[in-house]
């Protein structure tokens, strides 16, 4: 059983080990070869060659993060719906019921967000 598992997944495991090794090697090479004391001019915010008028860190409205998180949640919902819709004929009643429960939970969450005013932009 274990040998069949290794036979099936050995190329993937080797690929992951090589990718992890190369990533670590690139990070180490970057740390070794990069300049340690960068020019202060390069650390300043770039504003068309002028001196920066103000701090480059601006306040960012939290609603943007909320919209991004809601987008990711509903984007993942669609990512789960496509394979489900394709295999709907093969999964039977249990697969249909589990997806309806999943959609119900997401719909309740969406209605809760709507009622709390998280989707209102004021």
Curated annotation (Swiss-Prot):
Q: Which residues cross the membrane?
A: 12-32, 66-86, 91-111
Q: Which domain of life is it from?
A: Bacteria
The protein's UniProt keywords, in alphabetical order, are: Cell inner membrane, Cell membrane, Membrane, NAD, Quinone, Translocase, Transmembrane, Transmembrane helix, Transport, Ubiquinone
Query: Does the entry feature the keyword S-adenosyl-L-methionine, yes or no?
Result: no
User: What do the Gene Ontology cellular component annotations say?
Assistant: NADH dehydrogenase complex; plasma membrane
Q: What is its EC number?
A: 7.1.1.-
Topology in the lipid bilayer is annotated as: Multi-pass membrane protein
GO MF entries: NADH dehydrogenase (ubiquinone) activity; NADH:ubiquinone reductase (non-electrogenic) activity; quinone binding
What is catalysed by this protein?
a quinone + NADH + 5 H(+)(in) = a quinol + NAD(+) + 4 H(+)(out)
Q: Where in the cell is it found?
A: Cell inner membrane
InterPro entries, per database record? NAD(P)H_OxRDtase_bac/plastid, NADH_UbQ/plastoQ_OxRdtase_su3, NDAH_ubi_oxred_su3_sf
Q: How would you classify this enzyme at the top EC level?
A: translocase
| Subcellular location, principal | membrane
Its function, per the record, reads: NDH-1 shuttles electrons from NADH, via FMN and iron-sulfur (Fe-S) centers, to quinones in the respiratory chain. The immediate electron acceptor for the enzyme in this species is believed to be ubiquinone. Couples the redox reaction to proton translocation (for every two electrons transferred, four hydrogen ions are translocated across the cytoplasmic membrane), and thus conserves the redox energy in a proton gradient.
Q: How does it assemble?
A: NDH-1 is composed of 14 different subunits. Subunits NuoA, H, J, K, L, M, N constitute the membrane sector of the complex.
Q: Which family does it belong to?
A: Belongs to the complex I subunit 3 family.
Annotated HAMAP family: NDH1_NuoA
Q: What is this protein called?
A: NADH-quinone oxidoreductase subunit A
Species name for this entry?
A: Pelagibacter ubique (strain HTCC1062)
């Amino acid at each position: 059983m274990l040998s069949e598992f290794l036979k099936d997944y050995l190329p993937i495991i080797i690929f992951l080990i090589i990718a992890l090794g190369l990533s670590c090697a690139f990070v180490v090479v970057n740390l070794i070869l990069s300049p340690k004391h960068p020019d202060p001019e390069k650390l300043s915010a770039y504003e068309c060659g002028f001196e920066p008028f103000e701090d480059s860190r601006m306040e960012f409205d939290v609603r943007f993060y909320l919209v991004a998180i809601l987008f990711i949640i509903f984007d993942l919902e669609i990512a789960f719906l496509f394979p489900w819709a394709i295999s709907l004929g093969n999964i039977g009643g249990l697969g249909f019921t589990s997806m309806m429960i999943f959609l119900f939970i997401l719909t309740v969450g969406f209605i809760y967000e709507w009622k709390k005013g998280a989707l209102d932009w004021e």
